[in-house]
Structures are given as structure tokens and as C-alpha cells.
């Protein structure tokens, strides 16, 4: 979990070239559409909605451990005493769960990581670039505390 919080891979869009779906499909293949209990152990995941009864909030990052019926999710959660603990949950208990090998830049707002990699699907001087794209790129760059890798289509 600590390594997950130290590294972010960001995409500007959910769909399209170099998008969140593109990255997940390339790395996970058909497993992305399967039951989360079939996802590989070690896969980063993100909670897609608030579940206060479990101590989870929309955007909380976790990781899969185990496989099949033994599959579980680990999430960092705040304890009643204000400390941070680790919660181990069965995947069926999470209403909205997605792989999180990469995140959209929008989803990563408010997050920071030591190392950030940004996948950018067009040249920075592209005529298709707009003010919205520049703001998105700025947001992505400012997520990095120590290092930034910017991968751009030539």
C-alpha cells in the first residue's frame, strides 16, 4: 500500500488513445471485465463511492491480495482514534470497484505522489490542444512531489 501511494500513473481521459481504459485493457486483457475476485493479486484498485459503514470513501486506493475465493482487498482507513489502519475486505462488499493501475488526472486531483508518470496522447504543440488540456496537464504535473515522467506521442 505504501508503494501504491508513492507512485501515480495518470491519463487525461477515461476513453480513447492512451486512456485509462486503454492502459487497463493493455495490461489486464479480458480480466478487467471479470469478477474482481478473478483479478490478479497485487492489482491496485480504487473505491468508486463512499461506503462509510466500511470506513471507505470515494477515491480510496487499495490493492488485491490472494486469488479466487481467498481474494481480499487491503485499504488504508482512519480508525476511531484518528490513526491509520489497514482494512481487509472481501471484494463483494465494495459496491463500485475499478482497477487503478492508472487514474484519470481528474480523479487524482487532491492526491500527490513522489513519482508521477503522465501518458499524454498528443504532441504538446498540437493544434488540437486547448486551454482545458493545458489545465489538465498542469494538474497532472503538480501531483508530483519528487519526479515526473511525461510520455507524449511524437
Where would I find each of the regions flagged by the language model?
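Conserved helicase/translocase motor-coupling segment
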Residues: 1-63
